[in-house]
Amino acid sequence: MSQNKMGKITAAEDTFRKAISLDFAKAPSKANLAYLLCDQGHFDEGINEIQTALALDKDNLKIHDNFLFCLNYSPDLSAEEIYTCYKNFDNLDSKNTTPKWLRVQTSKKKRKLKIGYVSGELSKTSVSRFIEPIFINHDQKQFEIYAFAKVPNHDYITSSIKSHCDGWVNIDEMSPKDLASKIRDLGIDILVDLAGHVQGNKLGVFRYKPAPVSLSWWVGFGYTTGLSAIDYFLADKTLVPKGSEHLFAEKVWKLDHPCSTVFRPDPNTGSVNALPALTNGFITFGTLTRSIRLNDRVIKTWANILKKVPNSRLIINSINFRYDEMKEIFIEKFKKAGISQDRLDIGYDSPPWNVLRKIDIGLDCFPHNSGTTLVEHLYMGNPYITLADRPSVGRIGSHYLNAIGHGEWIAHSEEEYVEKACDLSANLENLSKIRQQLRPEMNASPLRQEKDFVKHLEQTYQQMWNCFLARKA
């Protein structure tokens, strides 16, 4: 994978194909090739390669993780087709899932519940902006908080989270079986997955059912784990609209709150600047998403917007585009869609808010929406257009907009998406006003009310626990 990390896309692809032809590490090579292809938007070939890899090594959980991860981004598969693959994952390695809890205390009516969080992102990552506020605001008079953390690089976020825990277990080198034993020994009541199928996850521990109650919270992965061993999927009515609950292996628990997460901005973000279009003389659309979300449907839709808004530009900025070869691949894709290179600014800059200051209107991706960068758009005064697509990964953008009271930027078709983007760009005076109002609106919204959100979350944990006790009685 080193060539891929260095931006040598063609060389990496050739290396993987040669390894496959020589029958060298064939399954892992096919899985790596698949991920590389999906990153370039070649989903049909990529998914076919990874399915072949699974046929060669059906018990390889890492390949299964990559397979399910890539499926979420496919622009052509239906939600039902994708969920079928998740159900197949549930049948893997189903042994050792018999409940085996130690010291489940049911005699006392009121006691501290022990909550355990399993995550590999308890450091300065995009997901930590949602996770850190939970740890900071937990009521430790009512709950004991434990972190089961895989953190290669400890930083100030790690220290902050750790300081609000009653217990911290480093799980880097622990097997799922050993971790399950540790969780049982500590008497954890409710175990929370914060990673889903992202790299380095510890989903395997949940197959052992080491705690009486378990749930997966959408912020780390965005969709079902596929594991029936996990009791609940924590979301809300926007992410999982009525009638779509059957697309989740877990029972969907919709939080009784305007949104199912809370966001703490990076303290270094800085202030909101004036609308760039006022000095540029043209509208700049933009995204900070990874390349895997930029499928042909998205590119066609964005190209139609650029064609309809005279002299407009598009910024595409993320770590996938730090090297020239990936830039050229997507410049060519837009060229085929009728957009010349001089209207594109593709690259990578950090921190993200410096790029966001150059953007007038954000464009969300579909069928898998963007995540943290959408909230950062809003915090920097940038409205964005999103397409409400399949649950729940395709409704993240809608979730944030509903939380701050701007559902008018949610589209329900690609045609409506184009129309909304064009309408928003047509009135610079209104767009400038929106830019200055968005941060105060967001700060006053449920998305920024940390204490209130965590209070509702804790009430949810207590309700889940009461349901367990009722079943056990």
Report residues per predicted region.
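Alpha-helical solenoid repeat scaffolds of the TPR/TPR-like class and their adjacent stem/linker regions
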Residues: 1-282, 300, 328, 332-339, ...
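Short hydrophobic "strand-cap" motifs at the C-terminus of beta-strands
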Residues: 118, 288-290, 317, 347
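Glycosyltransferase donor-sugar binding loop
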Residues: 149-153, 313-328
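Substrate-binding clefts and catalytic carboxylate motifs of secreted carbohydrate-active enzymes
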Residues: 286-297
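Hinge/capping helix and adjacent helix->loop/strand transition within the periplasmic-binding protein
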Residues: 301-308
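Short alpha-helix at the nucleotide-sugar/activated-sugar donor binding site of glycosyltransferases
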Residues: 377-379, 402
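Conserved acidic donor-binding loop of glycosyltransferase catalytic domains
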Residues: 387-388, 393
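Short acidic/histidine- and often glycine-rich active-site loop of Leloir-type glycosyltransferases
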Residues: 394-405
